């Protein structure tokens, strides 16, 4: 199990989940919560699940389960609990009072991990904004709960700085961060516009956290992105050019990983980053085919894409980590294209490239034209933005066979074209 490297104190926690008819598998969700807790530097010493029609509106779990959790806290010398859902301010305050310990929820935990992962100025702005929005509604309970240990999960902002706890100062800081983020978003839109004008198609690499997205981009392009076997190892999007056959190119963008119950504070704060998938021409969905929860993770990814408005695009599903699959292989899921691969070993990646070439061909127009030697500049544009299949030098000019993006087809036609 992975542990976070800037841990101030060891936190021993009890995990709490509520199984309702709407929840598919709370036990698996708590396993994931345990991994999240470990990533943030906490040790899980116990898990409690309550079957209920709905979560308790006042305390998340019922009185009997609260007593059970209190006994576990004492028995295992634990100093906090983490609930598998986002708690309301009232639930957090009441549970903290009943248990007399530090109370956290999945959202607080994920925000804490993001705070430690953010490296760029944009990422730090987005994370701090999400943290402060979450805290602003929970100041009274959080101030008491988080002060119990003087540090640890929930107290750290990006760069290890302490988060603000004064409501007035939080409002001021949120306004400043929103203004900074607006400038960053303008810059991102400018870059996106330049890509569009460059006529290069873009494929967004999406997937559940730790599915192998960064490893895929590194293997394909040598991007040099941090690729660890940890949840949310990558927060900041990275774009690289992938060289394909016949001189064709496509832009690949790595994105932040998705997860069940992704906090809406993060979705809102990371909107400009997540929208890389919305504005991409194609989606490459990386699925960890060795994970027992692969099907549930797939549905989470599709639901998140739907919420982002990133539907209606051609999707390539990569059944990744084939080198780690044991027993019955994962069945092929619905997608326009499905490729079995291992981003780590490179298995299947040539097939992925072939699919990308096919997709590019579908978006291009085939031409056979004779260009005068004075029109060689147009051939250079074809070479740069399309696929130059062949060129034959003749006395009266250069005969070209090529595929070009529809957007530049008219502009690269020779004057002799009728």
What function would you assign to each model-found segment?
Residues 1-112:
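N-terminal accessory targeting/assembly segments
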Residues 363-418:
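NTP-binding/hydrolysis catalytic cores, primarily Walker-type P-loop NTPases
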Residues 7-10, 148-267, 271-278:
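Conserved G1/Walker A P-loop phosphate-binding module
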Residues 20-25, 55-59, 117-122, 161-162, ...:
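Flexible beta-alpha connector loops of hexameric P-loop NTPases
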Residues 101-151, 158, 311-316, 321-373:
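Canonical P-loop GTPase G-domain recognition
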Residues 126-129, 133-136, 140-143, 164, ...:
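Alpha-helical coiled-coil heptad-repeat register
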Residues 2-5, 27-31, 54-70, 236-237, ...:
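Switch II of P-loop NTPase G domains
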Residues 29-38, 70-75, 87-101, 247-248, ...:
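Conserved C-terminal guanine-recognition region of P-loop GTPase G domains, centered on the G4
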